[in-house]
Amino acid sequence: MEKALMLFLAVSLLSLGHTDGKENAETLLKERTKRQIPKTLTVTTILEKPFAMKTESDALEGYAIDLLSELTQSLGFNYTLHIVKDGKYGSKDQEGNWSGMVGEIIRKEADLAIAPLTITSVRENAISFTKPFMQTGIGILLKKDTAAESSYMFGFLNPFSKELWIGIIISYVITSLCLFLVGRLSPCEWTEPASEQNQFTLLNSLWYGVGALTLQGAEPQPKALSARIIAVIWWVFSITLLAAYIGSFASYINSNTNQTPNIQSVEDLLKQDKLDFGTLSNSSTLNFFKNSKNPTFQMIYEYMDKRKDRVLVKTFSEGVQRVRESNYAFLGESISQDFVVAKHCDLIRAPEMIGGRGYGIAAELDSPLIRPLTIAILELFESGKLEYLRQKWWENTCSTQDQTGWVPVQPHTLGGIFLILGIGLALGLIVSFMELMCKSRSNAEQQKKSCCSAFSEEIAQRFGKTQNQEGLEKKSPTSNSCDEVKA
């Protein structure tokens, strides 16, 4: 018993020592990391909403400023912050000299650059970056009234999506064919005088479907139960469809249709001639199009390069202003565009985003600061702090109506009525076959034939040539064909 107790105490002490050792190792690692970072760092940034903005007292606030504060708490360093002197992010000229924040890092005028600075291969050759603290891409910023500019000649088709229109046309054709088949199969539809053919010809069936869609009664009127089932189901389908169309069309006219831009992608920019489009001069966005092997992106760059004096802007704010005041589309960082869209309800960003990239904190090449900063950024990401800062600075101030917008009716919205129509058509066809089988059995008893033989004869006569149809009309009594089926 004493040995067992001593063994238990020994294991407990070893476990405690292991835990303490692990905690001490983590503490030592943090202390070692802090010792690698100078007590005071010089940080450069750029005035870019919402990353860094001046308050009324000329102090700086924004996402980048809050991120810097979180890093100082985590790594225990002080900093002096200044705005980049030339107001640029950083690009290399023909002589190999760097401008902007990248240039300040290289010239050791700053230890860190915390801003929406895109991580690119060219910059990575000159400076070092941490892991991205935010992901972004290239978006298209548009003014709503120009974004939604489209052909109003066919605007009446907009309440329904293309897929729904295709479904309606297919349903109309199938219903007309079913009505035509029922008119041929059902004996009750062959009660006309011998001089007339069956009333539900293919043309009449198509016309009847159109009449129901426009809520206008159309001749001929169905007499057989099977034909009436199909007619009733089609009328229910038509009324539901028209109600949905009228409601969607009213919403389309009265709502802000600019929420669904006609410019969806960079390809759409090339296909139109009403909007100029450009980006920041000497920016990573411009270099992306310049260095891309994609033919479409090359055409985008050629367009901007030929008109660079007219379409390239010096600052992001200038690009936003041009979008709001003229027919201009601005290509730039999607994350910054999302911010201005959240604050200016007359702007919208096109759905497509290309050239995914990230924002990172920059330091001099092979700087020992990169690793501890990267670890701190990952810890902030895992704790949800970065997402909190994102929600804080990208808060949408537009009304709910501005955010919701209008969208066309999709097939899944009316899926139930399509299902009911399909069931009704199947039921109508089944009933018409039952009507014909009843008539065939009656003829078989009168003519002393087998039911199968009489049924085959009826089918052949109904889908034969005109002379066979006339023979059927003369052969079938005009007064009691439906009565026989009902009996």
Curated annotation (Swiss-Prot):
Residues 464-487 are annotated as: Disordered. GO terms for cellular component: postsynaptic membrane. Keywords: Cell membrane, Glycoprotein, Ion channel, Ion transport, Ligand-gated ion channel, Membrane, Postsynaptic cell membrane, Receptor, Signal, Synapse, Transmembrane, Transmembrane helix, Transport. Residues 18-162, 250-413 are extracellular. InterPro entries: Glu/Gly-bd, Iono_Glu_rcpt_met, Ionotropic_Glu_rcpt, Iontro_rcpt_C. Residues 184-228, 435-487 are cytoplasmic. GO terms for molecular function: ligand-gated monoatomic ion channel activity; signaling receptor activity. It is a multi-pass membrane protein. It is found in: Cell membrane; Postsynaptic cell membrane. Its main location: membrane. Residues 1-17 form the signal peptide. Residues 477-487 have a biased composition (Polar residues). The chain crosses the membrane at residues 163-183, 229-249, 414-434. It holds the Pfam family Lig_chan. Glycans are attached at N78, N97, N282. PANTHER family: IONOTROPIC GLUTAMATE RECEPTOR (PTHR18966). Belongs to the glutamate-gated ion channel (TC 1.A.10.1) family. Receptor for glutamate. L-glutamate acts as an excitatory neurotransmitter at many synapses in the central nervous system. The postsynaptic actions of Glu are mediated by a variety of receptors that are named according to their selective agonists. This is Probable glutamate receptor. It comes from Lithobates berlandieri.
